[in-house]
């Protein structure tokens, strides 16, 4: 299962009661963070989650409201006695940008391993996370992310016996290991059926609606998408500033066939997003106005 927390929902600047947009997930003891604006570490503390377990930090782009909180977070992670390396993922220029921010956090008790995304779409596997970065349409290079948790096929004892797999290897093979024993190589597909549907989360902020968002979000269990503007009369602002309205995000969710939509990254002038949800739900009924620390646990389909 995948624990998901929308740490903040504000765009451009933090507001009283609304931190800057960021997402955190937990999976098998490993945490992943997408974006880290001013105050993100406070939002993590308010949620009661730990800095220590953050193994992966992804950045959508390098505007200040998405990255300015990184030095403080890194210092807090160091103070939490973290020593394991942290993987940092982001668009081209990642190491240069992070190095500049680290002027105030030059010494850390852990390494930063940088993965710069340069292609329109790239897949990165870290721990049990399958991370897919995809280019979106903002006024700087910007990426959305899908986070997938793969699920193995069902264990089929008859298949294991037919393939003469020793019983003592069954457990390790079910965990995805490949084992060499007595001059034979045993692989998971010798005891498992077809791969089952896993968990899929899609996160997209700072973009105009583009086809690749629909493509990447297809069938997501949860789609977290920016809704900078709820007011229909601000459609021109959305176009000019390369953002989205609630209604454009809802249309993306509808076309992608997602199960649930959470809106986020609200304009500072948008103080009551719930007032615009009635018309949003007319487009996509399972749309919800994101709130700081809104959380859910996504689980595997028990019928699979």
Swiss-Prot record:
Key words of the record: Endonuclease, Hydrolase, Metal-binding, Nuclease, tRNA processing, Zinc
Molecular functions (GO terms): 3'-tRNA processing endoribonuclease activity; zinc ion binding
Cofactor: Zn(2+)
Chemical reaction(s) catalysed: Endonucleolytic cleavage of RNA, removing extra 3' nucleotides from tRNA precursor, generating 3' termini of tRNAs. A 3'-hydroxy group is left at the tRNA terminus and a 5'-phosphoryl group is left at the trailer molecule
The protein's Enzyme Commission number: 3.1.26.11
Binding site for Zn(2+) 2: 65-66, 206, 265
UniProt cross-references to Gene3D superfamilies, sorted A to Z: Ribonuclease Z/Hydroxyacylglutathione hydrolase-like (3.60.15.10)
InterPro entries xref list: Metallo-B-lactamas, RibonucZ/Hydroxyglut_hydro, RNase_Z/BN
Keyword Oxidoreductase: no
Cofactor note: Binds 2 Zn(2+) ions.
Active site (UniProt): 65 (proton acceptor)
Binding-site residues, Zn(2+) 1: 61, 63, 138, 206
HAMAP family: RNase_Z_BN (MF_01818)
Family membership noted in the UniProt record: Belongs to the RNase Z family.
Function, as annotated: Zinc phosphodiesterase, which displays some tRNA 3'-processing endonuclease activity. Probably involved in tRNA maturation, by removing a 3'-trailer from precursor tRNA.
PANTHER family: ZINC PHOSPHODIESTERASE ELAC PROTEIN 1
Subunit structure: Homodimer.
UniProt protein name: Ribonuclease Z
Annotated organism of origin: Lachnoclostridium phytofermentans (strain ATCC 700394 / DSM 18823 / ISDg)
């Amino acid at each position: 299962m995948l624990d998901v927390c929308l740490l903040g929902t504000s765009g451009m600047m933090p507001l009283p009661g609304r931190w800057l947009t960021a997402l955190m997930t937990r999976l098998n003891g490993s945490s992943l963070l997408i974006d880290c604006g001013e105050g993100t570490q406070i939002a993590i503390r308010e949620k009661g989650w730990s800095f220590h377990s953050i193994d992966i930090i992804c950045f959508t782009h390098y505007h200040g409201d998405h990255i300015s909180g990184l030095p403080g977070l890194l210092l807090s992670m160091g103070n939490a006695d973290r020593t394991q390396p942290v993987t940092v993922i982001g668009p081209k220029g990642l190491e240069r940008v992070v190095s500049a921010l680290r002027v105030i956090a030059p010494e850390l008790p852990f390494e930063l391993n940088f993965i710069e995304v340069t292609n329109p779409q790239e897949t990165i596997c870290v721990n049990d996370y399958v991370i897919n970065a995809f280019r979106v349409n903002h006024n700087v290079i910007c990426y959305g992310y899908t986070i997938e948790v793969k699920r193995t096929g069902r264990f089929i004892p008859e298949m294991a016996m037919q393939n003469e797999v020793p019983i003592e290897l069954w457990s390790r093979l079910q965990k995805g290991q490949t084992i060499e024993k007595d001059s034979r190589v045993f692989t998971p597909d010798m005891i498992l059926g077809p791969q089952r549907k896993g968990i899929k989360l899609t996160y997209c902020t700072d973009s105009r609606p583009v086809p690749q968002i629909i493509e990447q979000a297809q069938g997501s269990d949860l789609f977290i998408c920016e809704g900078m503007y709820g007011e229909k009369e601000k459609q021109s602002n959305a176009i000019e500033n390369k953002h989205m309205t609630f209604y454009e995000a809802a249309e993306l969710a509808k076309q992608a066939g997602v199960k649930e939509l959470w809106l986020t990254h609200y304009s500072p002038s948008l103080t009551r997003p719930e007032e615009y949800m009635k018309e949003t739900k007319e487009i996509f009924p399972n749309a919800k106005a994101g709130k700081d620390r809104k959380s859910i646990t996504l689980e595997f389909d028990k019928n699979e």
